[in-house]
Curated annotation (Swiss-Prot):
The modification Phosphotyrosine is found at residue 139. This is Enolase. The lineage of its organism: Eukaryota, Sar, Alveolata, Apicomplexa, Aconoidasida. InterPro entries: Enolase, Enolase-like_C_sf, Enolase-like_N, Enolase_C, Enolase_CS, Enolase_N. One of its GO terms (cellular component) is cytoskeleton. SUPFAM superfamilies: Enolase C-terminal domain-like (SSF51604), Enolase N-terminal domain-like (SSF54826). There is a cross-link at residue 138 (Glycyl lysine isopeptide (Lys-Gly) (interchain with G-Cter in ubiquitin)). Belongs to the enolase family. Pfam families: Enolase_C (PF00113), Enolase_N (PF03952). The gene is ENO. Substrate binds at residues 166, 175, 304, 331, 383-386, 407. PANTHER family: ENOLASE (PTHR11902:SF1). Keywords: Acetylation, Cell membrane, Cytoplasm, Cytoskeleton, Glycolysis, Isopeptide bond, Lyase, Magnesium, Membrane, Metal-binding, Nucleus, Phosphoprotein, Ubl conjugation, Vacuole.
């Protein structure tokens, strides 16, 4: 029996930062299926276009009424009557025919907006799962050609200390995450993570005062930390005090594009200070040396965006130096774009993809980016954005794609915990057919 799309309606809702975003209700003969898209703060210049209205009299220019209009008036009429199980066909139709905009890196979604296309793409996945009488994670696994019997629960990468563009402190690196690789299950990994988080909170309160325990966009803390060493010392002490030494490791997201000077080709580790300390302006090679030093001193297992999104040379240097032991993740470098991934493979620039569905703008293309990375023995980390909604789609996606790792904030703030709570449910429903990635998180490739 065909399960056709009978109605599509888009609306403007608010994300976790109070900015507008797109939500879609897609109706089939089986009911209404809803999806909402997230939005990033530190965005890569090569991401597919997130369409904003730029009408300064409304939401400071961040409204998404044009994207809503594009869905309701351009996309919806073309999709009514199509079978909701035709995911690839519908995604390709929206991206290539209805939008059709391109750059040298592929389909850019600059006509209709990646936020418009993705909201429908996600809702269609939910409708397709219902039509196939299966869960969303199993349906997504089928779309990706993955094993649907034995499935992998991811290691959570919990962002607990914030810096960079996410925080008002002096810290240049954007995220410091705890990664409970030594836990026996996802449920226990979250317990380890939550206990370290609360231990860290009390340590920060003692050292920096109660104001420093206010949380940022992703639920992490932003105490007045000056540099990476101070942040890492604080994490190591908190992990030890919570009783999880050797079981909880550390990951960093540097977001180095945010403090790169394109003219001088240098990195300013004091970029948030008006009269910056010139000794903290580093060359690419000096930054390579700093990462090598940090990895020797601290239990760091993953570094994301260590250099600018166009600094292929230093990415390759770092990957060659420490890539065997440390995951080097491309986010702004790759923007979940298969063409950028091909270039990174050719240049041996990194060894892992950060998968953000809204960077590329359709589920079909996101799956393609993941499969290309896994085929080349890269790790893949599924990720949220700093502006999130209560939508839990990425929790199902990470299990479906068997990537073994997810980052979706601290164990705090409901839009972050919504994803982790969905993973608790999935782990429970899988029972003996689900296994936790643990310290093999880089190897979930089948």
């Amino acid at each position: 029996m065909a399960h056709v799309i009978t109605r599509i309606n888009a609306r403007e809702i608010l994300d976790s930062r109070g900015n507008p975003t797109v939500e879609v209700d897609l109706e089939t003969t089986l009911g209404i299926f809803r999806a909402a898209v997230p939005s990033g703060a530190s965005t890569g210049i090569y991401e597919a276009l997130e369409l904003r209205d730029n009408d300064k009299s409304r939401y400071l220019g961040k409204g998404v009424q044009q994207a809503i209009k594009n869905i309701n008036e351009i996309i919806a009429p073309k999709l009514i009557g199509l079978d909701c199980r035709e995911q690839k066909k519908i995604d390709n139709m929206m991206v290539q025919e209805l939008d059709g905009s391109k750059t040298e890196w592929g389909w850019s979604k600059s006509k209709l907006g990646a936020n418009a296309i993705l909201a429908i793409s996600m809702a269609i996945c939910r409708a397709g799962a219902a039509a196939n009488k299966t869960s969303l994670y199993k349906y997504l696994a089928q779309l990706a050609g993955k094993n649907t019997e034995k499935m992998i629960l991811p290691v959570p990468c919990l962002n607990v200390i914030n810096g960079g563009s996410h925080a008002g402190n002096k810290l240049s690196f954007q995220e410091f995450m705890i990664v409970p690789v030594g836990a026996p299950s996802f449920k226990e990994a979250m317990r380890y993570g939550a206990e370290v988080y609360h231990t860290l909170k009390s340590e920060i309160k003692k050292k920096y005062g109660i104001d420093a325990t206010n949380v940022g966009d992703e639920g992490g803390f932003a105490p007045n930390i000056l540099n990476a060493h101070e942040a890492l010392d604080l994490l190591v002490a908190s992990i030890k005090k919570a009783g999880y030494e050797n079981k909880v490791k550390i990951a960093m997201d540097v977001a180095a594009s945010e403090f790169y000077n394109i003219e001088t080709k240098t990195y300013d580790l004091d970029f948030k200070t008006p009269n910056n300390d010139k000794s903290l302006v580093k060359t690419g090679q000096e930054l390579v040396d700093l990462y090598i030093e940090l990895v020797k001193k601290y239990p760091i297992i993953s570094i994301e965006d260590p250099f600018d999104q166009d600094d292929w040379e230093n990415y390759a240097k770092l990957t060659e130096a420490i890539g065997k032991d440390v995951q080097i993740v491309g986010d702004d470098l790759l923007v979940t774009n298969p063409t950028r991934i091909e270039k990174a493979l050719e240049k041996k620039a990194c060894n892992a993809l950060l998968l953000k569905v809204n960077q590329i703008g359709s589920i079909t293309e996101a799956i393609e980016a993941c499969l290309l990375s896994q085929k080349n023995n890269w790790g893949v980390m599924v990720s949220h954005r700093s502006g999130e909604t209560e939508d839990v789609f990425i929790a199902d996606l990470v299990v479906a794609l068997r990537t073994g790792q997810i980052k979706t904030g601290a164990p705090c703030r409901s839009e972050r915990n919504a994803k982790y709570n969905q993973l608790f449910r999935i782990e429970e429903s899988l029972g003996a057919n689900g296994s936790f990635a643990g310290d093999k998180f880089r190897l979930q490739l089948n």
